[in-house]
Structure formats: structure tokens, C-alpha cells
Design a protein with these regions (language model features):
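Conserved alpha-helix/loop element of class I SAM-dependent methyltransferases that forms part
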Residues: 7-23
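A short glycine-rich, Lys/Arg-flanked "PGG" loop and its adjoining helix->strand segment in the class I
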Residues: 101-115
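Glycine-rich SAM-binding Motif I of class I
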Residues: 34-38
């Protein structure tokens, strides 16, 4: 059952959130300001972690009380152990990767399930 968010969340992020099981371990790669991760922690009680390239995004995420580190998905995903997370999310980030196939390989290695979304520039 889907509940309305307690704070604003983009429509595409709500759709991703609906795919995540309550109480699961989640890694949000390219988490930006942490909006999705904050929602998942608050509404689905996930154990959430984030990886974000932008110092401003890390600051915003940490300010929300989230466990987010600064890192580059093209380089830093190799450091994560196999099956460390139930869900690995890569939202609106794949198109910015220098090595997208390597990043996707790490996603399916790190998580039991991977959720990948890309922006629709036509909208």
C-alpha cells in the first residue's frame, strides 16, 4: 500500500520508492540532496546509505541526517562487498557515467536488486 509522502518527492522518485521493500538495506548512488533516501528511511524504515559526487549534495544529505559519503561511482563502487545491499538505486545518474557498463556490473554485484532510471529529456 502506498501512502502519500510526508514531504515533497518527485513523481519518478515515488515510483522508485514503491519498488523498495520496507526494512531493506539500500544504497542510493548519485543520491543528490538525499530526498529519495530520506523518504525511504522515514516511510519504509530502510537502512539507507548514499554515495554522491557533489560536495553540496553530500552536505544537503548529511544535513537531513543521512549516511552519505562523497564518492565517484565510476571509481568507488569496486570498494563495496558483494551483496551488501538489498537494493541499489541509480536514478538519473547512468547517463553521466564514464564507464556505464562497469557501473551496472557493480550494481548487480553489490545489491540483490538494482533499480536504474534515466531522465526523459523529451518531457
Amino acid at each position: 500500500m502506498t501512502h502519500p509522502p510526508t514531504f515533497p518527492l518527485r513523481q519518478d522518485l515515488r515510483r522508485i520508492a514503491d519498488l523498495v521493500t520496507a526494512g531493506s538495506r539500500v544504497l542510493d548512488i548519485g543520491c543528490g540532496d538525499g530526498a529519495l533516501l530520506a523518504y525511504l528511511v522515514a516511510e519504509k524504515q530502510v537502512i539507507g546509505r548514499g554515495l554522491e559526487l557533489s560536495p553540496a549534495g553530500v552536505h544537503d544529505s548529511v544535513s537531513r541526517g543521512l549516511s552519505v559519503i562523497q564518492g565517484d561511482a565510476d571509481q568507488d563502487l569496486a570498494d563495496y562487498p558483494d551483496l551488501a545491499f538489498d537494493f541499489v538505486i541509480l536514478s538519473r545518474t547512468l547517463q553521466a557515467m564514464r564507464q556505464p557498463l562497469d557501473v551496472l556490473r557493480h550494481l548487480v554485484r553489490i545489491g540483490q536488486r538494482a533499480i536504474v532510471s534515466i531522465p526523459n529529456f523529451g518531457l
